[in-house]
Every structure is written in structure tokens, then in C-alpha cells.
């Protein structure tokens, strides 16, 4: 059987890692080819991961990745100016566990140069799936040119300004997410620089005003990239029973909880079951859609209590949460509200009860921000 992966961005590399690992350790007989267009460059920003990701690096590269792949540890997320109760809220990861920060271009180069399981790379721009001789194709070629075959996901943001700050010695070991008058800003400490991004809505704040506020609040001198975006989910993620979508080709949501990398891994797990374990297309698509909608609803929940700023953006963001159906999250909150501290402590090492979040994480946001 032959599997072709299109694109060597984050999702393409994760897909290659996933299926190459199972080929080696479960003796899955599959030929893997990764095809990419070298003219397409990664978005120039830092990347945070969820807790599952270091384990996948270890499974593919062993402990050597710690010394040869430039990363910083991520021990949690610091929320600043969210809600009305506290100026700062730190969401810690369970003791002894951590996620990572890194640059996507360095991650992608590392995977393609060090994946210790045979696969071939080909630099080519593929126009038609029918031109590919493969039993299955995983398409990870990024943002679609048209959203005709996609549903819109609900979120108050649609643009980001990307920049860098000079590296600090002994910098923090977590991601900062700071609420601003226009939305929020991420701060990701990398080995050689600080990646910082200002997220906002162009229907509320002009790009020029956002640039001005970004520079004023965070001391940014040069803005590297203006990144407008839509938030969406494919209506059909398995096409003609053999083309499987992943990465931004499958869905896109804002990066507030750094859910992208963990979601790409989860999607690969579903596709593995579809290809090798006989899971149906209908069940596979249902599970992926359910996963993405849970992420969509919990991210939107972060805006429910507003922020330190009573601005037009935050009024609209709170209203958006109020008028949007969050049935999946509401069911989870109803259960979690009544859980004891002992019950919650038993979930600390959970890989995720509600998409990527154990009950402890959701309860913390409810108690410290939203209630």
C-alpha cells in the first residue's frame, strides 16, 4: 500500500511522523512519500504545542531531539487581563509534564532531515489528485483557496500582526496570552528570539490602528507580517474515500490554546483507524468534527467574561459567545461544576476529556474567570 502526504508544513511533518512510526513499530506495510512545493514557506511565527507533542518527538527521534532540535519548554499558559477577577491567571501543566515552543521552519527541517524511517521527498506542485499513484493521500497543503466546501467556525478574530522581540536571558517557561483593547497578544519565548503576535478583528479595529497599539503596548519596532485569516472546518474531510485532509487544509482556529499540533496528531490517529482498522468514513468524520467543535466552543468560552478592557471588541466578543450555541461545552460544565477537588486531581494527567482539556483545566477557567 502506498501513502502520499502533500505538504511539508507542520501537519505534513506530523502525518509523516505518525505513519512512519506505526510502520516501524507495528510493522504496518506502507510506502510513504512526502511531496511538497519548496516555494511555499511557513508562516513566520513561533509555535506552541500541547502536552502530547514531546511524546511524539521521543517516539520518532528518541531523546536525541532534546539536544539537536531547538526548543524551549512550555510549562503552562499565563493569561493576563482576562476576565474581571484577576490580573493574571496561570494555567499550569501537570507536574513533570511539559509542552514545547519552537519555530515551524526549524521543526519542519528537523523532521525531514532526521526522521529515521525511510520515506522519500519530492519537490513538485501537484494540481490534481488523479495524477498521484497512491492508495491514500493526506493533503496538508495549507489554507484552501476557496471556502466553498467549508463551514465557518465561530470566533471574534480575523487578523494577526506578527513580530519579534530580542531574546531575554532566563526568560519565562510558558506562553503569555495578554488581553488587549483590540483582542489579545501571544508571547512565545524561543531559543533565539521572542515571537509575538497581536490578534484583532479588522471589522472593529483597522490594521493601522492595531499596528499602532501593538507597538505602543508591547514595544514592537518592526511588524514582519500582516496575517488575515478565516476560521473554518471542511464539510467533507475524506474525499472519494482516499483523500484525507489535515492541517489548515482541514480546519483553522485561532491559536489561543495552541491546539493545532495536538489536533493534527489526533486527526492522524483517526485516519490510521480509517485506513488500517476498518473504521467507517462516517464515523471518522464525525469524530474529527466533534473534536474541532469542542475546541471551537472552549476557545469561545474564554471571551465570555470579557477582559480588563470595556471596548467595542470585547463587547462584541462577549455578545458572540452569548448568542452562539455551545451545547457540547455546556454539558461538560454541568458535570465539572459539581466535581470535588479530589475528583479533579485525578484528572491532572488525563490526555483530555473535552478535546484536549482535562476537567481540571475547564474548571479552573470557570472558577477563576467565567463564573
Regions found by a protein language model. Give the residues of each.
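Helix-loop-beta segment of a Rossmann-like dinucleotide-binding subdomain
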Residues: 86-108, 190-201
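Short, well-ordered alpha-helices that flank and scaffold nucleotide-derived cofactor binding pockets
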Residues: 17, 21-25, 113, 273
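Glycine-rich FAD pyrophosphate-binding loop
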Residues: 20-45
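Predominantly flavin-linked oxidoreductase catalytic cores and closely associated redox partners
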Residues: 110-219
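Long, low-complexity C-terminal extensions of enzymes
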Residues: 277-371
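N-terminal FAD cofactor-binding segment of flavoenzymes
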Residues: 38-87
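Beta1/beta-strand and adjacent pyrophosphate-binding region of the FAD-binding site
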Residues: 1-11
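FAD/FMN-dependent oxidoreductases across multiple families
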Residues: 200-304
Amino acid at each position: 500500500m502506498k501513502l502520499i502526504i502533500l505538504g511539508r508544513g507542520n501537519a505534513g511533518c506530523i502525518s509523516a511522523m505518525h505513519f512512519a512510526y506505526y510502520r516501524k513499530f507495528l510493522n504496518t506495510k506502507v510506502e510513504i512519500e512526502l511531496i511538497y512545493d519548496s516555494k511555499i514557506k511557513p508562516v513566520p511565527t513561533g509555535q506552541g504545542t500541547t502536552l502530547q507533542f514531546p511524546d511524539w518527538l521521543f517516539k520518532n527521534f528518541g531523546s536525541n531531539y532534546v539536544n539537536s532540535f531547538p526548543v524551549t519548554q512550555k510549562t503552562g499558559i499565563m493569561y493576563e487581563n482576562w476576565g474581571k477577577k484577576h490580573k493574571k491567571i496561570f494555567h499550569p501543566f501537570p507536574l513533570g509534564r511539559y509542552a514545547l515552543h519552537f519555530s515551524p521552519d526549524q521543526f519542519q527541517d528537523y523532521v525531514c532531515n532526521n526522521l529515521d524511517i525511510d520515506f522519500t521527498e519530492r519537490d513538485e506542485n501537484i494540481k490534481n489528485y488523479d495524477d498521484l499513484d497512491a492508495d491514500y493521500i493526506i493533503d496538508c497543503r495549507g489554507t484552501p483557496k476557496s471556502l466553498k466546501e467549508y463551514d465557518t467556525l465561530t470566533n471574534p478574530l480575523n487578523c494577526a500582526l506578527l513580530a519579534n522581540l530580542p531574546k531575554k536571558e532566563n526568560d519565562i517557561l510558558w506562553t503569555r496570552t495578554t488581553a488587549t483593547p483590540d483582542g489579545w497578544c501571544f508571547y512565545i519565548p524561543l531559543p533565539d528570539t521572542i515571537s509575538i503576535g497581536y490578534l484583532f478583528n479588522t471589522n472593529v479595529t483597522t490594521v493601522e490602528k492595531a499596528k499602532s497599539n501593538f507597538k505602543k503596548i508591547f514595544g514592537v519596532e518592526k511588524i514582519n507580517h500582516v496575517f488575515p485569516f478565516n476560521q473554518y472546518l471542511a464539510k467533507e474531510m475524506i474525499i472519494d474515500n482516499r483523500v484525507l485532509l489535515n492541517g489548515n487544509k482541514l480546519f483553522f482556529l485561532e491559536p489561543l490554546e495552541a491546539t493545532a499540533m495536538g489536533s493534527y496528531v489526533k486527526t492522524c490517529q483517526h485516519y490510521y483507524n480509517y485506513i488500517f482498522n476498518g473504521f467507517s468514513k462516517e464515523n471518522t468524520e464525525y469524530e474529527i468534527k466533534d473534536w474541532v467543535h469542542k475546541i471551537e466552543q472552549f476557545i469561545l468560552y474564554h471571551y465570555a467574561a470579557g477582559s480588563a478592557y470595556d471596548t467595542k471588541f470585547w463587547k462584541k466578543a462577549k455578545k458572540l459567545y452569548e448568542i452562539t450555541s455551545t451545547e457540547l461545552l455546556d454539558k461538560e460544565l454541568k458535570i465539572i461544576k459539581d466535581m470535588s477537588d479530589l475528583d479533579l486531581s485525578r484528572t491532572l494527567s488525563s490526555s483530555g476529556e473535552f478535546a484536549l482539556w482535562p476537567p481540571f483545566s475547564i474548571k479552573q477557567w470557570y472558577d477563576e474567570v467565567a463564573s
